[in-house]
Curated annotation (Swiss-Prot):
InterPro entries: DNA_rep/recomb_RecO_N, NA-bd_OB-fold, RecO, RecO_C. Belongs to the RecO family. This is DNA repair protein RecO. Involved in DNA repair and RecF pathway recombination. One of its GO terms (biological process) is double-strand break repair. NCBIfam families: reco.
Length: 229
């Protein structure tokens, strides 16, 4: 049996039988993993097996199945409520539906941690929106789906501030089109400038289409609660 220690967050939980829980954990060391937690219904473990609690988890692999051995919290549960809570549920759903199992990406894990801590502290919706847009971009990169905010997709020419572009999912930005985005906005987003509401609105529009393309038709339920993307 191989034992591993992981930094983890619970992304999804499903009860299994009378005593156990099936978990989907997002970990720094192994990415997204599925594991069985025996005794998961005990009061102590139920208090730990919740979203937004940073965990240290020891697992072992037997017959191509991961089992938890020990679970401890490394800090208290993040205080998420209202828009922050719905946003946390949103990014958890994104991870659940887009990541392949056992594919570690420490940069994405760090982005997840940064985003959760940021939305827990945020007091303005615009701040939360900007954090979500940056996380969505980190997720797109982790999944190998990126596009240039600096170059026109079909010609390779530089984006011009005074020109208008249309976003084509799976391709990038093309000059003209029906749904026009100012080149100025694209260059601002490329520079990570989401301080103006117009830039943030364009980033939201672009990321919504890009994420939907990545999801391949899967529905994100948290959008109906908050509509963060």
């Amino acid at each position: 049996m191989t034992s591993k220690s992981l930094n983890a967050w619970v992304i999804h939980k499903q009860w299994s039988g009378d005593t156990s829980a099936r978990l989907k954990l997002f970990t720094r060391e192994m990415g997204l993993i599925n594991c069985l937690c025996k005794g998961g219904r005990t009061p102590k473990k139920q208090s730990l097996l919740q979203a937004f609690i940073p965990l240290w988890v020891s697992i072992e692999e037997r017959y191509d199945q991961y089992y938890t051995r020990n679970i401890e919290s490394t800090s208290s549960r993040l205080d998420l409520e209202g828009h922050s809570l719905f946003s946390g549920l949103y990014i958890n759903e994104l991870l659940y539906y887009t990541l392949s199992p056992d594919f570690p990406d420490p940069d994405l894990f760090d982005a997840y941690l940064f985003t959760l801590n940021g939305i827990a502290l945020a007091r303005e919706r615009e701040v939360i929106e900007a954090l979500l847009r940056r996380f969505e971009w980190a997720l797109l990169k982790a999944c190998g789906y990126t596009f240039s905010f600096l170059h026109e997709a079909r010609t390779g020419e530089l984006i011009v501030p005074d020109s208008y572009y249309q976003f084509v999912a799976g391709e990038g930005f093309i000059l003209g089109g029906d749904k026009k985005i100012p080149g100025e906005h694209l260059l601002a987003i490329a520079a990570d400038n989401l301080s103006e509401s117009a830039y943030l609105k364009s980033a939201k529009f672009i990321m919504r289409q890009a994420i939907d393309h990545l999801l391949g038709g899967r529905e994100i339920k948290a959008r109906s609660l908050y509509g963060p993307a």
